[in-house]
Structures are given as structure tokens and as C-alpha cells.
Amino acid sequence: MAASVDRQYHPAPMSGVVRTPFSNHHRSDSPVRNGYTFSNPPSSNGVVKPGEKIKLVDNNSNSNNGSNNNNNRYDSDSEEDDDENEMNVWNEMIKKGNSELEPSSVDSRDEGTADQWIERNPSMIRLTGKHPFNSEPPLTRLMHHGFLTPVPLHYVRNHGPVPNAKWEDWTVEVTGLVKRPIRFTMDQLVNDFQSREFPVTLVCAGNRRKEQNMTKQSIGFNWGSAAVSTSVWRGVPLRDVLKRCGVMSSLKGALNVCFEGAEDLPGGGGSKYGTSVKREFAMDPARDIILAYMQNGEKLSPDHGYPVRMIIPGFIGGRMVKWLKRIIVTTTESDNYYHYKDNRVLPSHVDAELANSEAWWYKQEYIINELNVNSVITSPCHEEILPINAWTTQRPYTMRGYAYSGGGRKVTRVEVTMDGGDTWDICELDHQERGSKYGKFWCWCFWSLEVEVLDLLGAKEIGVRAWDESLNTQPEKLIWNVMGMMNNCWFRVKTNVCKPHKGEIGIVFEHPTQPGNKSGGWMARERHLEISDSGPTLKRTASTPFMNTTSKMYSMSEVKKHNTADSAWIVVHGNVYNATRFLKDHPGGSDSILINAGTDCTEEFDAIHSDKAKRLLEDFRIGELISTGYTSDSSSPGNSVHGGSVYSGLAGLAPITEAVPLRNVALNPRVKIPCKLIEKVSLSHDVRRFRFGLPSEDQVLGLPVGKHIFLCANVDDKLCMRAYTPSSTIDVVGYFDLVVKVYFKDVHPRFPNGGVMSQHLDSLSLGSIVDVKGPLGHIEYLGKGNFTVHGKPKFAKKLAMISGGTGITPIYQVMQAILKDPEDKTEMHVVYANRTEEDILLREELDKWADEFRDRVKVWYVVEKAEEGWKYDTGFISEKILRDHVPAVGDDVLALTCGPPPMIQFAVQPNLDKMGFDIKEQLLIF
């Protein structure tokens, strides 16, 4: 077959071609040659910074007194020469890769977060919003660098803020079932042990998770197929450290080795990240487990665990604790929250609720340690176009990709199919390591296959699968699990015919997904076609390939034009929806849609909507978003705002415009604003007042009375959004206050996990950042008894204000505005229901107003359970209570309510109806 030529057209400057030259000289068990040590060991006379380059000194001339245990382990000069050659090859790879990188810098998205001091590569794709930083490189860039991944492009998995560590202050404690517990300094780890240096491929257990999420949403975020990277790691063998501390035998109960990091995380009510491995793994020299302090010839970077982390070759990344602080030898496995609630593959029928209620997390058999076998097609890359002409059809096309397996098992075969698995072609493999002396292979390999272009033209899809030396291979179909982990089904690339230029045809290749919340990929398109009732069943033969023409395609520039109440379009998971006719029916009000009209709001839609809402969305689908480079308008990240709910706006509402504000207003309906926690006060055992500083001290929040804001935060790697109404006045400058009831886990039987956002807020330390978006809501109080509801005016002289629990906050906001205006004479009659007297929020303020403004403020409390001496009502809101404490129905009376849906549905609405209120016209529900 003729030699392959690089003649395919790429919309991006880099292709999926592996460019690293072949090298078959690596062995993964090579110690640092002749016992290298630092020429100037880090000490108190100098600060060692992350990413610092290391100068090596040959200690071969030193006498072997055993103090550093740096014995020459080489048996022959030829082996020593091989190891020196491979180190030279690594250094050249690293040097070349670094020379091709753009400079790292502090990302503006990190400003105001705990990570604002960290420089990062701008090309990294963020998967969990602003914070914490979880990211992967573009797949084409990852493959461009080949065998060794430059550190700035290595995938990152962080559960929280990165510790700002100092070398000279850092220690690693070894304790538990050891005879000599020791706390090692970094200098001791570097100088008192023989170090090892070898390449290892790290893979997140969530690699390719987005494919699972497109099938059914898991509890994890959207990793693409680039959560895999390879570096040269240098560190101290774990077994040597444990032996130095006198690790006890298995007979004495030393069965597990636990690792604990330094970061403070919200999981489990607040904990460090921790996990464990079995003792036999930790002490097995063939496992090559090290405490690593160097990556690609430099000190670890902050995101990768500076100053020291675990490297456990062949295992998932989740076992390799970063920012290592403690090693504990125990009888039982780690009891850390993240050891049990992360990195498990549960049976497909187990969802999050069942996993919690039936304790599936704690079943030993579902833990993940070793990686499974996996492979990915990287060339053709996503949206690559192969022109079909006389020249290209005379030459083969070279397909490429990567493959890996776990436990040191070598990948022995990679196969490609273009007919759905009926036939397979064997690929050429490129292993750039020669295996350890124990026969272990810790790194990925690359595969390639030359195919005829005409065969591609007739193919429906291309699939790949790998085999390892244990004859493990990849399953044909995806196997869903609640954490979306270890996805290794065949990787499939779809093909379609396109017209890249006038008078030309070509093949456009489509990968299954795109990472994070980026739209694109055949899975999103096919998912919506499957559940759509419209359109004929798609059929295709090899002789008539075609692009999908049954679903109308829209560019992002077209979607952006539809951002008003007259035409409100949104994008969710690559599909375009016309939400205009739903504006008046949206439970959250039209603003919830209008703040997102004309944008891609995938992330926030998923964060606040149920599966039922997602099914309802299908009624409004009008087509797909064009994402291919040959037909779509170019769009920058700034052109897509991931924010807010899904629908928004009434036909009668004016469009959201970016008018110049009369005052310096913080809120922007199109943009999330970062707000810093500057004060936290405990008002009771479960009530907090949070004060958040605005981005500028001279700003007001800009929230109209009656409307609310969304608080947005990443909790356990998922976007969480909740609506809150500030308790501070609308004209306060520089900050806003929230009074929040914290719903702790294991307190309310119906909600054993408690409130996600309230517990997260309670866990925040001063200086933490949350994102705020708004305003939104369908009710606005304009003053002097005037409201607008869905854009329509309403007026009242008397207000019946009925609230329950935290639903008092919008009621409180309206009361605050009325009482602040001396010309506003509106009467307010408040009935406020709670479980107990202790649960009453803002009682001091309410009682003060009732006493100070007796002629127009009446407050009545209702609790389910009361202590002796309680002078208000007990039980639930009834018709009698309302008749006694709110105004009788009249043309100048409106009822306002906010609280739990059952209270509104079964107490407020029926009892007001009995009193003669027109529920549709006279009851305003926040």
C-alpha cells in the first residue's frame, strides 16, 4: 500500500496526528542514574517554587556509605547507556513540547477565587465552570505532542481550591501501624532516599464520561476523551518510605495504606481528600508506586500536587492523592468521604437515590483501582473534512489514535471496523516504552491504520477497540453507571458527506461528543432524534451517504438574534428551542428565560431542571445548532453565555437591553458576577446571615423589589443554582445580605442529604467567591401599592402576605421597600408559618416593624409545635386564621405568598378561594 500523506483539510491548525518520533528504548523501572541529587538542596536559604527546573549532580564519585542508599543498580555498561539515552530522548521531547506552548497566565475567570494566583494554559477546556479547576486539553493538541504531555496541557482534576504550599514548610507524616512514625520534610524525601524517574500515563476514571451523560445523566461532569496524559515522574518509592518507618506485617493488622491530602473540601460535611490501597500493592516493587515531587524535569506545578503527590502506575487518577500530607497504615481501608462516594462503578440499575438509601457506596466489590482497556480515534478529528477528488482518492488515509490499559498490562492489539463490527482491520502499534524489568507497561501507546478513501466514503461510521495481554477488550455498547466512570465502549466516529467548497464534496467526521458543555457530536443529535415524534425514520445506504437534512440547522449568530420576548430562542445540548410560546406558562416567570434568550444555557438548564422539565423541552425544539467549522459562523467563548434557567419572557415584555445605568449597578442579566463572602453571622443553630461584597465598592446590586437572584456554585463538581431574595435594602452600596436557613444532612427524614446549596454556603470561608446572576422573577413592586406581574399592572391598598419558612424573604423585601417610603401608605397583614418558634426567620425585624407601624403592619405567626406560653396560633394555616388576620377580599386587596409548594397548594389557595379571592388575578405567587 502506498505511503500515507498528510493531505486532509483541518478546520483547526493542529490535526490529530501523533508527531512524536518513535522510540522503543524506554524502561519504566530505571532509577535516577547513579543516584542524582539536587546540586543545591532546598533549604531555609532559598524558596523552592512550583515548576522550578532541577539541576542534577552525579554522585558516582561519592563513597557508598549507605547514608543516601544510592547504590549503583546497573549490571552492565550497555544498560546504563540505554538509560542515559532514554533520558536524553525524554529531555528532547519535553524541551520541544514546551517550546511550542503559548505562555501560561492567570485566567480572568480565576480572579476573585482561591486559585487567582495560579498561572494556567489558556487552551485548557474548563469542565466545571469557574471553580474548582477541572480541565482537559483539546484532543488535537494533546495528540500533537505525542508520547509526553507538556505539564500545562496535562489534564487537571481538582475537588476544591489548590493549596498555596511552600517547600520549606511542607511535611509528610507517616503514622498508624508503623514502628517508627516519622514526619518527613521535603528535603529529607529528596536527599534521604534513592529516587526513581519514569514515564506514567495518568487517566481519570471519568475519561469519556460525556458519552455516558448523553445516554443518561450521571452525577459527574462532562469529561471528553482527553482526560489522559503522560509525564515523566520522579519521586521516592513508597515501599522504601514505609520500610524506613518500620511498617508492621499483615499478621499484625497492617492491611491498608491510606493517603490524605491537604485541601479543605465540602464533602461529608468537610474533609480532606483521602483514599487507600492495599498493603500488598504498596509494598510490591513491581507496582512502582512513588511519592512524586518532579514532573517532566521540573518541580510539580500547583495543579498537579506541589510539592508532593502519589503516583500509582496503572491505577485511576483518583487514587493518586495530590498535596500529600499524611500516610496512615491501617487495618481497614480509608474511611474518607471521597474514598466511598467517588470512584465506583455501581450496577446500571442503581441511581444516586438508591445508592444512598441502600448503601451501595460501601460495597467493596464496586471500587475502582486499575484502569480498564480503552482506545480512542484521534484522527480523523472532530469536524475534520476530507475532500474527495482525483488526488485524495489515489492515496490512503491514515487513521490514528491512542490506547491504554491498567495494571501494567500491555496493549497487544488495536482493531478498526468500518462496517459495524462485521470485519476488523489490525492496526500498527507504536509502544514508546520497553516495559519494566517486571514486564509492566505503564504508558499509553499509539495506533495507526491506512485505509482507502473510497472505503471511508461508503462507511456509516468508524469504530475502534483495543485488546491487552490478558485478552481484555472493549464492549460494543456503552454500560451506564451512576458515576459515569470507566466508559470504554467502542469509540465511534460518524461520517457524512458535505460540500466544503463550491463544486466540491468531502467527508466530514463527527466524534460522539465534545468535552464540557460544548455543543457538537453525533450523540447529542441522535439522542434528540430518537425521542422526537416528528420527522421520518432516517435511513442510509453505503451508496447514498448524506448529512442529516430532516432537522433544520441554525448557526449561533442566528440564535443570538432571537433574544426578546417576541422571539426567545435558547440552545441546550446542541439543540435549538423556540421558547416564546412558553413564556407566559413558565413557573419561574418570563425573566428566567429572557436572561438566557439567544444563548447556550445548557449548564444552567441542567442545574435547575428535573427530568420532567427536560422532556417538556422537546415540544419546543426547532432544530440543531451548527457546530461544524465549514458551515457555522465562528464564535468565541464570549459569544455563548452559560447561564440561567431555560425560558424567559412574556409577549408583552420589552426585550432585555444593555442600557447605560443611571447608577453603577452590579447585576447584568447576561453575565454571572463574582461576589466575595465578606461576613458570616450565625443567627441560630441553623440560620446564617451571609454578606457578599459586590465586584466594586461603589455598586448597588440593582435588584428590583420583588425579584430574586440566582446563586451559582460548583458543589461536588456539578453546577448548583438556587434562587434567593436578599434581606438588605435595594439601595445599599457595595454588598448584599442573604439570610439563609441551613438544611443539614440527616436532620429531615425526607431529605437525608440536606440542602446542597445551604450546606455549601455554610461551609464557605471568608473570601470565598460565589457567582450571582439576575434579576429574575415575574413580580416587581414599583411603590405606593403598584405591582407589575408578568408585565401587567396591578394595584392594592392592602396586602395579605402569607409566607412559610424561608419564603419570608421576598415578603420581607416588599415590606422593607414600603416602609422605607414615607409616602407609601400600603397596609401589610403578614401570616407567617413555621415548624417551630426557633425556625422563624427575621422575627426581630418583623416584630419591630409591627410595633413601630401599628396602623399598617400586622404580623401573626403559626407554628406546628409550640412551647408553653405561645400567644399565636399552632397547627397549619387555615381558613379561620386567614379570616382573622388578613384583609377581606376587595378590589383594593392583593394576596402575596411564598413558601413550600404544599402550603400554597393545600392551604393558601383553597382557603383564599373560600374567602372569595380571585386566585388567578388577586394571588401573586413569588
UniProtKB/Swiss-Prot annotation:
FAD binds at residues 722-725, 739-744, 751, 756-758, 809. Mo-molybdopterin binds at residue 204. CDD domains: cyt_b5_reduct_like (cd06183), eukary_NR_Moco (cd02112). Residues 58-73 have a biased composition (Low complexity). It comes from the Eukaryota. Heme binds at residues 586, 609. Binds 1 FAD per subunit. Binds 1 heme group per subunit. InterPro entries: Cbr1-like_FAD-bd_dom, Cyt_B5-like_heme/steroid-bd, Cyt_B5-like_heme/steroid_sf, Cyt_B5_heme-BS, FAD-bd_FR_type, Flavoprot_Pyr_Nucl_cyt_Rdtase, FNR_nucleotide-bd, Ig_E-set. Residues 1-85 are annotated as: Disordered. It catalyses: nitrite + NAD(+) + H2O = nitrate + NADH + H(+). Residues 670-782 form the FAD-binding FR-type domain. Its EC number is 1.7.1.1. Its cofactor is FAD; heme; Mo-molybdopterin. Keywords: Disulfide bond, FAD, Flavoprotein, Heme, Iron, Metal-binding, Molybdenum, NAD, Nitrate assimilation, Oxidoreductase. Nitrate reductase is a key enzyme involved in the first step of nitrate assimilation in plants, fungi and bacteria. Homodimer. Belongs to the nitrate reductase family. This is Nitrate reductase [NADH]. It comes from Spinacia oleracea (Spinach). The gene is NIA.
